[in-house]
Amino acid sequence: MIEKFNLGLLDLLSILLPGGFLIGLAWQSGWLEDWPMLSGIPEGWASGAVFAASAYVLGHFIHMIASYLDELVFEKIKEKKWPDQTLVKEVVQIKDSEIGEIDRKHFNAFKWSLAYLMQHQPMMYQAVEKHIAESKFFRSFLIVLLVASLWAFVQQSWLEGLLSLGFAFLSLVRYATQRQKSIESAYQYVIAAKGKGRQA
């Protein structure tokens, strides 16, 4: 129960924090000061509620844009840094034996592994989901930091821009490593679970 709450909180923060950070950046730049929707809001809890709701909505758009990094960036990093296909080939064989051959574009080995663990090994699925949630957070934060660095350079704030780029690089590293951990963990858990099933 506590583990599910922690994962839910991490998922929420992966949406809320990047959105809140970007709204704060826009407010600091003066873009939102004359926005009609915000001019009539009183101080106090109402303004906080509007900020939280706006951050949540904006965070979803950031999440949607950031999801394209999986194919555009992560897959290229994976080919160079983690080229070994042993685990995925083993899982594909297990998947094909369970549900037959399906076009990988529609139902790849990773998606099937998550579905299998969710149905048959929920504790293993939660362990994988932790890596997924963390990778999503840093994936979204990477987009925010790139926007922040661009804004800083436009304002000729060179130090802030370089710092934002540095943190963006660290976010990219963390996103890629956690994404890879989630994939490897899912494959390993499926192989281990099927091995136990055969022994039983």
Describe the function of each predicted region.
Residues E3-L17, M118-L162:
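Transmembrane alpha-helical segments and their cytosolic interface motifs
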Residues G30, K80, Q93, Q121, ...:
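Short, flexible coil/linker elements and helix-boundary hinge sites characteristic
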Residues A66-Y125:
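Charge-rich cytosolic interhelical loops and cytosolic tails of multi-pass membrane proteins
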Residues D103, F107-K111, F137, V147-L170, ...:
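A contiguous, surface-oriented mixed alpha/beta subdomain in the mid-to-C-terminal portion of proteins
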Residues L162, G166-A200:
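Alpha-helical oligomerization segments
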